[in-house]
Amino acid sequence: MAMMVFPREEKLSQDEIVLGTKAVIQGLETLRGEHRALLAPLVAPEAGEAEPGSQERCILLRRSLEAIELGLGEAQVILALSSHLGAVESEKQKLRAQVRRLVQENQWLREELAGTQQKLQRSEQAVAQLEEEKQHLLFMSQIRKLDEDASPNEEKGDVPKDTLDDLFPNEDEQSPAPSPGGGDVSGQHGGYEIPARLRTLHNLVIQYASQGRYEVAVPLCKQALEDLEKTSGHDHPDVATMLNILALVYRDQNKYKEAAHLLNDALAIREKTLGKDHPAVAATLNNLAVLYGKRGKYKEAEPLCKRALEIREKVLGKFHPDVAKQLSNLALLCQNQGKAEEVEYYYRRALEIYATRLGPDDPNVAKTKNNLASCYLKQGKYQDAETLYKEILTRAHEKEFGSVNGDNKPIWMHAEEREESKDKRRDSAPYGEYGSWYKACKVDSPTVNTTLRSLGALYRRQGKLEAAHTLEDCASRNRKQGLDPASQTKVVELLKDGSGRRGDRRSSRDMAGGAGPRSESDLEDVGPTAEWNGDGSGSLRRSGSFGKLRDALRRSSEMLVKKLQGGTPQEPPNPRMKRASSLNFLNKSVEEPTQPGGTGLSDSRTLSSSSMDLSRRSSLVG
């Protein structure tokens, strides 16, 4: 029999209890084996007649075996209980660490709330003071009205307002909405979700940057980045997100080297923390390719764009709309390198995806067809380009007015009929001959207006002047700006080349995102996954950026300087240019250089013979 173990007086630790239990289990298993060896001869059938006392020995051995089995079971229960207690303790430690993090975050939020409350209090005080000043000014104004000997200078009070009304057009026409293809991609990053506070911070930074207040947006990003690195460390997905936001702000300031450094850092962090095949890595690669494209480094941008395409095909499948956006980006890069065959291949793939997944009426289908037609023009495939242009116009017509029949024809059919019957009539038919198709331009995307002008230029090359005039007249009646004269000029230049040269002019370096993310999305990327969109001329353009606001302010400042100097004819008002919200905005714009074709976004226009038109463009169409 084994010796009895007496408990020690001191308290045993959990590890000591586990070790002691394991030792007891080994001893009990050995003892069980000995008992079974002793019991086996006694219960064997060939034992013959039982010896005296063997029955009692058998009973005692059986009782001992039962006690041993019970002891082994209790020892196993003790081990299982010890393992469970260890797991509970580990979970307890995790919960404590989480509580500490939540306490820190709560403290940070309390500090932010306190600061915001102070700002709100100061704002309320300022509002109250301004309201009091307003009441005082109203009182003084009433006194002046009652004064019969009012000073003549008082009549000049409305001059600044009238001057601004002359300089800025009415705001009846709103700017076109962002492209539907630039959806938010920030939430589509696999297992990583961007925190809500970073989304809020991104929106705040975008607001400041859109107002040109980079002196506020950049320090805000840097402070948030510093706080994130202190709390989460440098190699954290949130840090990569913040780096991406700051890079986009730098990119909008034309600080491309700083933006490239930040994007490379964000790419390294995301590859390390999220894996090399994560959608967020693809979004960062795309943003980096956009940046290289803006700097004219198309060869360096192409492998980045291809890698982003491989990741998205692997994660999302080869027929996802985001894959089509990436294919369009890659096609634009190849187009700027003169790789016409690859451009055609990528646009065809993108068109197939858009038509299959989003339907034939999606704006991206018409936009991609327009870009593919531009590619055909560069290759001299005029018949293929004409077919695509007609498909775009026919689809737009059917969407608005139903299927095509003898009485319901798209505009290009009317144009060709007018061309055929031009010798039979002296005067041009009234515009009502087209039916009511021209109204479709008011509700369709700018791609329709682009197509009208491009097909008109193609007709003009073929000598169909009446048909070309019909389409151009229809496009000019469109109040929404679809394609600026610069783009039309570039299409005409392509047609004049005849042979479809591959040598592209240096295109605009502005390329933007679609999603978004848009948004990085692209908030993240913020993503939005940035998408480059062509205008049918092969140049790279940027959508969803601050370029529209900058161009409007630049032209406003030019007109203001001319107005103040006097004697210089004023440019016709642009319906997409908004009024400045304050004189501070206007003064800031006046101080900026206004040389046409100089620095800023004017450098990102395609170089062509229509440089004067390029300097007057109001936005980057996407």
Curated annotation (Swiss-Prot):
Biased composition (Low complexity): 538-547, 601-622
The UniProt record lists the keyword Repeat: yes
Membrane topology: Peripheral membrane protein
TPR repeats, residue ranges: 198-231, 240-273, 282-315, 324-357, 366-399, 449-482
Region of interest (Disordered), ranges: 145-191, 476-548, 563-622
An example Gene Ontology CC term for this record: plasma membrane
Any GO BP annotation: lysosome localization
Cell compartments where the protein resides: Cytoplasm, Cytoskeleton; Lysosome membrane
Coiled-coil residues: 78-143
Pfam families tied to this protein: TPR_10, TPR_12
GO molecular function annotation: cadherin binding; kinesin binding
Main location: cytoplasm
Biased composition (Basic and acidic residues): 145-164, 493-509
Disorder this protein is connected to according to its UniProt record: Spastic paraplegia, optic atrophy, and neuropathy: A form of spastic paraplegia, a neurodegenerative disorder characterized by a slow, gradual, progressive weakness and spasticity of the lower limbs. Rate of progression and the severity of symptoms are quite variable. Initial symptoms may include difficulty with balance, weakness and stiffness in the legs, muscle spasms, and dragging the toes when walking. In some forms of the disorder, bladder symptoms (such as incontinence) may appear, or the weakness and stiffness may spread to other parts of the body.
Record-stated family: Belongs to the kinesin light chain family.
PANTHER family: KINESIN LIGHT CHAIN, KINESIN LIGHT CHAIN 2
Protein name: Kinesin light chain 2
Organism of this sequence: Homo sapiens
Lineage, top ranks: Eukaryota, Metazoa, Chordata, Craniata, Vertebrata
